[in-house]
């Protein structure tokens, strides 16, 4: 039953205001030409799968490594992380940067992800590592016991000397075991002990914040610090980042540490990141997808872009809205046309981006029958309503909410493509 009093009270203009919430205020961190945090656009990041670096032919290996990084950059990745896991990779960095620069990108898009060997590499290859735009430190394995603080301090001092931003990246798969054990012991003695999951989340947040504070004490400025706490479960991700946002103003990198493959990976990533972004939390994101053999690594970039575009935080390509089809839709023509329009946009976008700024905000509707076709088309910049069962074999086209013309015959796509081209030329110059 409808609660009229509640409806009258709640259905105010404020209730219908658009999300997201106001952005969580964070310090701005500049990585090359990319700005993370503050009111800057959410940054899309990826990680290269990498190649084996042949110690006897580092330059040739570096070129193959750079090829993947360049593919990710062309797909829209604004930062690309590489595993800084060997002396060979450290030696390859200048050659990788050279290839990236040749392609017209800034070599500073590279983020070096160091683990156990990071302290050694920054000492042995200081001139190479400083060519990176940012380095990532994992507090859980940069060193253990008495060596932890010593190695952490050396890396931070190196970053300060060379003016390199640092991401302090905590991961629940490699969490500082001493900190975790300490919190577990304290919890076991408590009169009101919490679950182990709560203590694990607390340890993640404390590890990140304690490490960031330690970096500040050493001398790393606030505009050089990004933090992250990676987990694999969506609810843990939301809990941990909500706590980080309440506790600090460091720039935040979002993502599940291992999202998984296929639909599961994409849905988990979307669920977690969307909630946080809608609540104003997050400055840079990555979709850590397990690609099936043969799948392009650039898929993770596309997922991040789709998340940001779907919730209105950024625009990368014209949006194509299309109906799913039902018993009213006639044949596969609207599905085929949808695919053709999407493919055409992909082909044209490199040119449009250069010549037609703003085209990424364009909205196109491809609908399959008269029920929602005209109405949905009127909400788009361009819309086409194909005929369903029992309808005349014609397709109505709408421009900026008004009827424009009717198409029919076997060349609907070619004619609609021409309409798209004309619209882009007329409105985005």
Curated annotation (Swiss-Prot):
It holds the Pfam family GcpE. GO terms for molecular function: 4 iron, 4 sulfur cluster binding; 4-hydroxy-3-methylbut-2-en-1-yl diphosphate synthase activity (ferredoxin); 4-hydroxy-3-methylbut-2-enyl-diphosphate synthase activity (flavodoxin); iron ion binding. It catalyses: (2E)-4-hydroxy-3-methylbut-2-enyl diphosphate + oxidized [flavodoxin] + H2O + 2 H(+) = 2-C-methyl-D-erythritol 2,4-cyclic diphosphate + reduced [flavodoxin]. HAMAP family: IspG. GO terms for biological process: isopentenyl diphosphate biosynthetic process, methylerythritol 4-phosphate pathway; terpenoid biosynthetic process. Converts 2C-methyl-D-erythritol 2,4-cyclodiphosphate (ME-2,4cPP) into 1-hydroxy-2-methyl-2-(E)-butenyl 4-diphosphate. Keywords: 4Fe-4S, Iron, Iron-sulfur, Isoprene biosynthesis, Metal-binding, Oxidoreductase. The gene is ispG. This is 4-hydroxy-3-methylbut-2-en-1-yl diphosphate synthase (flavodoxin).
